């Protein structure tokens, strides 16, 4: 069967991604000073305005206004003429402490300790109810679906040629989308490449709109598309459509063009729609929030299963109840590609991975990563995807369980 599948990504200057990065910069700053911080930060941006709200309980001392301005400047919003700039936007802060009704389900006297006993791990519950998914497949070296992998590559390259000055007329806001042709479940071609990028009204001495767009399209093909596909077997061909700014113009962008909000790019953050999503956002949440930590753990498990050769693709669902440590349910699906039965895979998962929230935090070191990485960790995954990142050293991307899973699977298979 032949079909098309599309995934999109956005640049770090997209309004929603500005919010995610500010929220995670706040999280980094708080966890660096106080690894036990409870954080549920939300950010809104609009023309000339940033609102930081949510619930935070911490011993850390952080200047939230300066932190937001620094991140906005780093992203590239430095010119007030564009309707949004780091040094001129208003930054409002409206933060409360975490609700004691929520905290009581997670708090224990032992939580602040580094190594907890099995009984202590059982006493630290999930910070909320919910369902989380993790996914991996062998379509790419990073065990991600090809469409989202390509979309992220292009979004990162689009930002890079702006930041280095290679294409100085580009502005921070941008989106990419790639449509891949599949045949019998395997990617066989590139149907469409779409890039929408904010730009100046004139380029050099070119001011006529169609001429401006023609130059942008030609430049993006050479500076973005070609480098992205340079090391890949699958290439665009004469039948591939290449669309750039299909409306014909993208001068007004960023928060001046659209308001932004944390948690509105969930599919971009994960698997590009190729796998299911539980609905919970990541950015601005400390590791006690299973929306984030359990989704990372589910990816870690799925990736190790696929890398171990136990399936070509694997999706894992985990569910939790607030205040309860052990998952309510665990479901695994290999879409007919598994070397073991679902029951055997579930047994392997339960044997080799501890899915209690406090154990996940310990296994992936989620509280101390900002401190250990010089004050920034979560803000770096807040743009260009939380998974399949070769440019970052992420604990949930490690393949350190492959040998254990292979050995355990061999015992199952030898018993048949």
UniProtKB/Swiss-Prot annotation:
Cofactor: Mg(2+); K(+)
Biological-process GO terms, alphabetical: one-carbon metabolic process; S-adenosylmethionine biosynthetic process
Residues annotated as binding K(+): 42
Keyword Transport: no
Any Gene Ontology CC annotation: cytoplasm
Residues where ATP binds: 14, 173-175, 249-250, 258, 264-265, 281, 285
Residue stretches spanning the membrane: none
Pfam family for this entry, one: S-AdoMet_synt_M
Sequence positions that bind L-methionine: 55, 98, 258, 289
Known catalytic reactions: L-methionine + ATP + H2O = S-adenosyl-L-methionine + phosphate + diphosphate
MF GO annotations: ATP binding; magnesium ion binding; methionine adenosyltransferase activity
Binding-site list for Mg(2+): 16
Co-factor binding details: Binds 2 divalent ions per subunit.
Classification via NCBIfam families: metK (TIGR01034)
Family: Belongs to the AdoMet synthase family.
Function: Catalyzes the formation of S-adenosylmethionine (AdoMet) from methionine and ATP. The overall synthetic reaction is composed of two sequential steps, AdoMet formation and the subsequent tripolyphosphate hydrolysis which occurs prior to release of AdoMet from the enzyme.
Record-given protein name: S-adenosylmethionine synthase
Source organism of the structure: Thermosynechococcus vestitus (strain NIES-2133 / IAM M-273 / BP-1)
